[in-house]
Amino acid sequence: MAKPTTIKIRLNSTAGTGHFYVTKKNARTMTEKMTIRKYDPVARKHVEYKEGKIK
């Protein structure tokens, strides 16, 4: 079978709350690590989320 173009990634909160989102990204077009600002419900504010591996 062929390797899939989209991979699942885990977006970890940089606030240190342990909260994370799981999303998909295209591994061919987005080769660098993903960072995005999203809402952290534990910290109750928008923080930066950085890409990490799904364990």
UniProtKB/Swiss-Prot annotation:
GO biological process: translation
GO terms, molecular function: structural constituent of ribosome
Pfam families with a match to the protein in the record: Ribosomal_L33
A cellular component term, taken from the record's GO annotations: cytosolic large ribosomal subunit
UniProt keywords, alphabetically: Ribonucleoprotein, Ribosomal protein
Transmembrane intervals: none
Matches recorded under PANTHER family: 54S RIBOSOMAL PROTEIN L39, MITOCHONDRIAL, LARGE RIBOSOMAL SUBUNIT PROTEIN BL33M
Family: Belongs to the bacterial ribosomal protein bL33 family.
Stated name of the protein: Large ribosomal subunit protein bL33
Gene designation per UniProt: rpmG
